[in-house]
Swiss-Prot record:
Pfam families listed in its UniProt record: ATPase
Name this polypeptide is given: UPF0273 protein PH0284
Listed Gene3D superfamilies: P-loop containing nucleotide triphosphate hydrolases
Binding residue positions for ATP: G30, G31, P32, G33, T34, G35, K36, T37
Stored NCBIfam families: thermo_KaiC_1 (TIGR03877)
Organism: Pyrococcus horikoshii (strain ATCC 700860 / DSM 12428 / JCM 9974 / NBRC 100139 / OT-3)
Keyword Metal-binding (UniProt): no
KaiC domain span: 3-247
Stated family: Belongs to the UPF0273 family.
């Protein structure tokens, strides 16, 4: 039996029939405002509460901002950082400004994937990480889309090899059918897609699991909400032709 890693996000483990299989790399794909970052941070935070060390790789936002945003949901990672259970990899500032005084793990040149992987590997070793979030993986190949699948596979090799279960946040434009980068869907073990659709003049949030190696899962599109405590998914409801139906 494959060991499961519980996301701890209400409704998600039910949809995944018990959680994410250990060592899986999951692409969390969606357009702007769909809740990808919140989902990934909630996954890390719940891991910390379960005693599983975690790493957040910040590519889109200043690490200080990331910590502040997490704290707004009541997810204060600072005590865990001090205990050596949580690490932030700064792949945003390139070590410019004050971050070089505050951040322990800094990627100076994002075009150098080897440096990126080495910094990440060091952080994993130092805290014995079990969960890793890369937000967003799209940033790594935004200027070289042809490299997307290769970069995903290089990262996957390191993460699965160190026993981590990982979420790669992937950005897609509004209305895009793909998952954010050519061939990336073939390089990962799982794909969870978050959507925000306008239905009768109202925006509705939904989640669907496109694939997940090592487990069966719900094949339906489930509605979810973002609250002041994070994401809540409704496994007993389904979004169908713009209407929320009870299962």
């Amino acid at each position: 039996m494959t060991r499961r890693v519980k996301t701890g996000i209400p409704g998600v483990d039910e949809i995944l029939h018990g959680g994410i299989p250990e060592r899986n790399v999951v692409l969390l794909s969606g357009g702007p405002g769909t809740g990808k970052t919140i989902f990934s941070q909630q996954f890390l935070w719940n891991g910390l509460k379960m005693g599983e060390p975690g790493i957040y790789v910040a590519l889109e936002e200043h690490p200080v901002q990331v910590r502040q945003n997490m704290a707004q949901f009541g997810w204060d990672v600072k005590p865990y950082e001090e205990k050596g259970m949580f690490a932030m990899v700064d792949a945003f500032t390139a070590g410019i400004g004050k971050s070089k005084e505050y951040e322990k793990y800094i990627v100076h040149d994002l075009t150098d994937i080897r440096e990126f992987i080495e910094v990440l590997r060091q952080a994993i070793r130092d805290i014995n990480a079990k969960r890793v979030v890369v937000d967003s993986v799209t940033t790594l190949y935004i200027n070289k889309p042809a490299m997307a699948r290769s970069i995903i596979l290089q990262l996957k090799r390191v993460l699965a090899g160190t026993g981590c279960t990982s979420i790669f946040v992937s950005q897609v434009s509004v209305g895009e059918r793909g998952f954010g980068g050519p061939g990336v869907e073939h390089g990962v073990d799982g794909i969870i897609r978050l959507d925000l659709d306008e239905i009768d003049g109202e925006l509705k949030r939904s989640l669907i699991v496109w694939k997940m190696r090592g487990t069966s899962h719900s094949m339906r599109r489930h509605p979810f909400d973002i609250t002041d405590k994070g994401i809540i998914v409704y496994p007993d409801k389904v979004l169908k032709r713009g209407k929320v139906l009870e299962l």
